[in-house]
Amino acid sequence: FATEGANIAFTDLVLNDDMAAGLEATRKEIEALGVTCRAYAGNAADFEETEKVVKQIHADFGSIDVLVNNAGITKDGLMLRMSEAQWDAVLNVNLKSAFNFIHACAPIMLRQRGGSIINMSSVVGVHGNAGQCNYSASKAGMIGLAKSIAQELGPKGVRANAVAPGFIETPMTAQLSEEIRKDWMKKIPLRRGGQTEDIANVCLFLASDMSSYVSGQVIQVDGGMNM
């Protein structure tokens, strides 16, 4: 987004000095690309806190044209062994946060008579995954939320879509055993994992006018794993 000239506002949960330093480091990295970037500390799962953050962002930037809902955690476990706390934590961060931000940003976009909302889902939100019922449910919810918002806000020019990444090469997936990685690759026709840039490129398309007639859709970025 920044390389295409978009000004960036992003939020993250800050619980200690190290997290605050990470927030500032990311802000500087983005701003070095020649755009305005501001970082905001906040708990996306908190409804009132999110409203305050969005009001501040709107005051600082003057408009909110694109919203990417990308907050996410995992607390995996088989359903019968999963605690209520595990379920609630994942649904609150992964799904409720998206509702909170959409609820706060939608009035601004409606007044602007335009905007693009992008929900980060997952292929497990499409077909499920054993041991991840909470995560799968949250990501399926992101799809349903995007489709519903697309219908509600579409008449005023606001679009909403979901992106469903598959196996993406990240520091988290790099920690998986070689056996698990090989098993994943067998399921992917392209026989490789995706890169974070693959996801960013699809989000950039959905944010831009190139997708001005695309709304209520789920774009799977998974190398053909889920057809």
What are these model-predicted stretches?
Residues 82, 128-136, 148, 176:
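Active-site loop-to-helix junction immediately N-terminal to the catalytic Tyr of the SDR YXXXK motif
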Residues 122:
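Residue(s) in the substrate-gating loop at a strand-loop-helix junction
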Residues 162, 185-210, 214, 221-223:
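C-terminal helical subdomain
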Residues 1-61, 75, 85-86:
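Short-chain dehydrogenase/reductase
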